[in-house]
Design a protein with these regions (language model features):
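Structured adenosyl-cofactor binding patch, chiefly the S-adenosyl-L-methionine
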Residues: 166-206
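RNA substrate-binding interface of SAM-dependent RNA methyltransferases
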Residues: 1-144, 200-205
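Surface-exposed beta-strand edges and their flanking turn/coil or helix-capping segments
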Residues: 20-22, 85, 150-151, 175, ...
Length: 206
């Protein structure tokens, strides 16, 4: 029951598509015609949201201090555990390549050892969260704004669910409460940055 923050990036748009002989990560810019042919809204296919959010989370002092654990749950119901040691590729193209590898091989190992940096794990997410830990969803639709610092527990773990999709609100069945953290709609990446900053301030991580 020691203190740490668990973040679930919910509804992430991570799926592969076969183009010629290779697989690519489906995205709205590169595969617009293909998406329209399949009757899908390209505006919803936004893996860049997950990429930007992961950069914010994994680069944070909170993560460097060993107080953060990140999970990704995709629109296709794939659950991914992100090892805190993972260095997320800076460029979107390289991130896409990494995700294709992960989705097909179910894990990605470190270049310099046997350690798995990213791995697909069994649903549901609840099986992987600390027993009895508070689970909070974030949504712009909640009327009253909560000061993030008030959500930071003194000494126990807490889970915060952040929507990694373009439009809509987090709608999962395992959160105990929903909070809004700003009077303005925030991007997922900015939400992640604000959350980690609040936890760093309260827990004295500088």
């Amino acid at each position: 029951g020691q203190r740490r923050l668990l973040v679930v990036l919910e509804g992430a748009s991570l799926e592969t598509v076969k183009v010629g002989k290779t697989f690519e990560l489906l995205n709205c810019d590169k595969h617009k015609a293909l998406l329209l042919r399949r009757g899908r809204d390209p505006g919803e296919v936004r893996p860049d949201i997950t990429h930007q959010s992961l950069l914010m989370l994994m680069d944070s002092p909170l993560n460097r201090a060993g107080l953060l654990q990140v999970y990704i749950h995709t629109q296709k119901n794939v659950l991914i555990e992100v090892n805190p040691q993972t260095r997320i590729p800076r460029t979107f193209d390289r991130f896409c390549g990494l995700m294709v590898q992960l989705l097909h091989k179910l894990s990605v190992r470190a270049a310099d050892g046997p350690q798995k940096l990213l791995k697909v794990i069994k649903n549901p997410i609840n099986d992987h969260l600390p027993v009895g830990c508070m689970k909070i969803g974030t949504s712009f639709a909640v009327p009253n704004v909560t000061n993030l610092r008030e959500l930071v527990p003194i000494a126990e773990p807490v889970t915060i669910v952040v929507g990694a999709f373009a439009h809509g609100s987090v709608n999962v069945d395992y959160t105990e409460k929903m909070v809004s953290i700003s009077n303005y709609p925030l991007s997922a990446a900015l939400t992640c940055a604000k959350i980690t900053t609040a936890f760093e301030e309260v827990w004295g991580v500088v």
